[in-house]
Amino acid sequence: MGYKHGTYQTETSSDISLPIVLDYGHFIVGTAPMNKVKRENRRVNEIVRLGTYKEAIQYFGDTYDLDFSISQAIKVFFELYKVAPLYVVNILDLEKHKTVKKTQNDLSLTNGKAVIPNHKLITDTLVVKENATSQVISDAVTMWTDEGLEIYAKPSNGTKIDIEYEEIDLSKVTKAQALGGYDISTMKRTGLELLDE
């Protein structure tokens, strides 16, 4: 019986799929859940080049709520098919495309946590109050999950809280805003007009 001498290799299939990088990119104009993006990363009517899924989440939020067209694109291009680059213009402005203030009362806390099944809530506007006294709970902590917004709070009295907030209203985003235009006074393009830049 003989021995094999030297080095040998075998090749097996892998679960890791490498991203496909195109010579050209796809151009998307749409809406993104900017309520889940850090303020310094929020972009409205600016072209952002995305090369990775990490960049997509950093600038345009997660893909839990597919009511947002940019979230749909990120899911398809980066999560499903891993195709890059993607050029994205968000037209959703949290200052313009939102509802009036809403309230929810008597939210029960379980182990100090309440879950709001809402991915459009604007956390910048969220106010958490004690149910019994209506006193603001300033040290409440929030975290986004696939279920919605988790609120962690410790009321001094009882196990219920009230909240006030505004939320994104996608019905206020118009076709005209998506098509965009050129503003002579600011010398800036918006929407699809940014394709010329």
Q: What does each of the following model-derived ranges do?
A:
Residues 1-197:
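Surface-exposed assembly/interface segments
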